[in-house]
Amino acid sequence: MKQWVGLGKFLAGHMQVIVPICVTLGVLFPQQIGVLKPIVPALFAFMTFQGALSNTFHQVAEVFRRPLHLILALFVSAVLIPIAAYAMSSLFFGSNPNLVCGIVLEYSVPVAVTAFMWISMFGGNGPLALTIILTSSVISPVTIPLTLKLLLGATVSIDVPSMMQNMAFMIAIPAVLGIVINELTRGWGHEKLSPALSPACKFMMMGVIASNSTAMSEYVLHMNVERLEVALFILVFAISGFIIGILVARALHLPYGETTTMCFTCGMRNISSGAVIATQYFPGEVVFPVMCGTLFQQVLASIIGHLFERLTGEERAKQRKRVEAGRDAMTR
């Protein structure tokens, strides 16, 4: 068991190398890796379950008792970043409204489910992350059409039942199940079961990333100058999303866990839902900016997560000492 857990830690420490390899494999071998697509929701659900084993219902309730961080994350991801995407894309690609539309749509969709995997890996606030992702998805049937209407004058409708069903299967049900097991076993789920499942989740994450990357194969293998410019823009703006989350959290002097959660929930988007909307309501040219995030999102999450973890090592050590001191004081 020690070797198995050690393998999980090794994989977690090298994700910044593993993730680009997974993306490359997905792009180069779409047919072979595409066979994983039918089981991706189940892989998501299992990873959510494993991450939720470290949480309690009391922690989730605290998010709603003090909702400032939740409201702030939703404001940044659903209002601030879409407006910034519209302003910057209009500046660089104003002559092509389809590209502007694709970029705005990319940053109008809900927070990515995969954000929870990275937040769990880098020690973020799990209950806050779950609440942000679920709330972002629940309000998206209102926020997406409203954003597109106000910024672009476009009208779309969202398949609400399908989206809610997916969120329930991938996030809500496995999260509740994980928390229930942790509560009933009085911490055994967090201390024993979660570490035992962690290595398997790392392999599942690789499969999910590679599978999602297959959607970009056609575009990447037939790249032109304009697409390259759009890809560069998406790369820079995607980095900005993570940084904005960190800066907002730092401005409010939030601790490491909450800052990590803000970083990933502001920087990561549910690209698959954006791709569905793009293909249903807009010309084909709109799809490329939306799907382009697939190339960078997971790679950036890995790199930025590791960089932030290193830069805050001293701060986290001080936090651990304060927590340990508090525990010692309570036991005396």
Predicted regions located by residue number:
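Alpha-helical transmembrane segments of multi-pass small-molecule/ion transporters
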Residues: 1-332
